[in-house]
Design a protein with these regions (language model features):
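Cytochrome P450 catalytic-core helices
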Residues: 224, 233-256, 342-361
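Conserved cytochrome P450 K-helix/beta-meander segment immediately N-terminal to the heme-binding cysteine loop
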Residues: 70, 300-325
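Conserved cytochrome P450 catalytic core segment spanning the I/J/K helices
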Residues: 18, 179-239
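Cytochrome P450 heme-thiolate "Cys pocket" and heme-binding signature region
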Residues: 89, 274-275, 289, 315, ...
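Short, conserved phosphate/pyrophosphate- and ester-handling motifs at nucleotide-, phospho-/glycolipid
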Residues: 57, 232, 294, 351
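Sensory beta-strand/linker motifs that couple input domains to effectors
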Residues: 54
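Conserved cytochrome P450 K-helix E-x-x-R motif and the immediately C-terminal K′/meander segment
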Residues: 20-41, 258-289, 295, 308
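Cytochrome P450 catalytic-domain helical core, especially the substrate-recognition surface
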Residues: 4-35, 50-51, 59-66, 75-196, ...
């Protein structure tokens, strides 16, 4: 640790404006800004509303994601959206670790196994037939599957749609407060917690063992379920839409035995969490770069997954690359370290279950624009029109 660092180090940076810095290109096209910055080196500076440093090599990722005491979530970009500025996502150490330990068992692969048959039934019922648009189809399917997994299917569809719909809109829609909708959703979650489906995640949180030594308070359980719903919705539905689009072009990957590698590759090529952020709580040195306290520290799975020094032909869909090992901290579709996405097992289960019925279909791309754009998460620009024949 270095004491007394007061200013960000002199680092390369993409072209910006004298006063506004990088705010205009950040607002218009943040992906292009990141790509331009990456061409200046593996660590670069951005002049946003506060000094920011971006890195994307494994050693940077490891340092930022492993040290929870130095790099903290509160005050970072996740706090800009009311959908994410709550619950475990917005909790730092020393509270984070015990709360995470209490929540993790209810989101584990073992705990989720009891819902697999019900999720498969939902996927089969929404199996596309004829012409369909992948973004709309995946959004409806993932909403239903999250409702089953989290709440046993108890929440009203209309309320879920009203709460989740802004996440599909361009910024600033996901950043705007919606207190009435949030209160109605939280009331519905609280009612579900009072009498939960025994196979749902809500049942585990309601059982009183979601925190060591006492049980999770009702308001905290409601908050964590609301955040899990929002965080899992557009990330998983956008990934699913891309997966179906590319599955139509590469039928050899429809075999259920091949799907895991295919999904790994879709998650690499299109990481929904395209950018992660922390606030430096104290002066530090990361990958040889001094990082003063108060700096906005950014890591980018989007840049890491597109780094040709880590991934050969990174812009191609090549699932077979996952038959070999990858360098540690080079694959971050769900983040990494102690704050790895709590819903990683649920997301993978939903994706695999949603795609399995399509192995029996003849899929064809009709027309669409799969290019990536960003809101809170990475998403296809769309639309993505396909045709499914049985």
């Amino acid at each position: 640790m270095n004491a007394g660092l007061s200013r960000p180090p002199r680092l390369p940076e993409p072209p910006g404006l004298p006063v506004l810095g990088h705010l205009p290109p950040w607002t218009v096209n943040p992906l292009r800004l990141l790509e331009t910055g990456a061409r200046t080196g593996p660590v670069f500076r951005l002049r946003l509303w506060r000094p920011a440093i971006v890195g994307y090599r494994p050693e940077w990722n490891r340092a930022i994601l492993s040290d929870l005491a130095t790099f903290r979530s509160r005050g970072s970009l996740s706090g800009l959206s009311p959908y994410l500025a709550a619950g475990i996502v917005h909790t730092d150490d020393p509270q984070h670790r015990p709360r995470r330990r209490g929540l993790s068992p209810h989101f584990s692969a073992r705990a989720l196994a009891v819902t697999e048959d019900r999720l498969a039934a939902v996927a089969q019922a929404r199996r596309p037939r004829g012409d369909f648009e992948a973004l709309s189809w995946s959004a409806a399917l993932v909403q239903d599957m999250l409702n089953v997994a989290l709440f046993g299917g108890a929440l009203p569809d209309a309320l879920l749609s009203r709460f989740l719909r802004p996440l599909h809109h361009r910024l600033p829609a996901p950043m705007l407060p919606r207190p009435l909708v949030f209160r109605r959703l939280e009331a519905a979650i609280a009612a579900t917690l009072a009498d939960p489906d025994p196979d749902s995640i809500a049942a585990g949180l309601a059982a009183g063992d979601a925190q060591p030594g006492g049980g999770q308070a009702g308001a905290e359980a409601v908050e964590n379920l609301r955040v899990a719903l929002a965080a899992g919705y557009d990330t998983t539905s956008h990934t699913l839409a891309w997966a179906v689009w590319h599955l139509a072009r590469h039928p050899q990957w429809r075999d259920p035995q091949a799907l895991p590698l295919f999904l790994d590759e879709i998650l690499r090529r299109y990481p929904a969490g395209w950018l992660g952020s922390r606030i430096a709580a104290r002066d530090s040195v990361v990958a040889g770069v001094p990082v003063p306290a108060g700096t906005l520290v950014l890591y980018s799975p989007y840049l890491t997954h597109a780094d040709p020094s880590l991934w050969e032909d990174p812009h191609l869909i090549r699932p077979e690359r996952f038959t070999a090992g990858q360098p540690a901290w080079s694959y971050l579709p769900f983040g990494g370290g102690p704050r790895t996405c709590l819903g990683v097992h649920l997301a993978r289960l939903i994706l695999r279950t949603a795609l399995t019925p399509l192995a029996q279909s003849d899929l064809a791309q009709v027309a669409g624009n799969p290019a990536a754009t960003v809101g809170i998460t990475l998403r296809p620009r769309g639309p993505l029109h396909l045709r499914a024949r049985q």
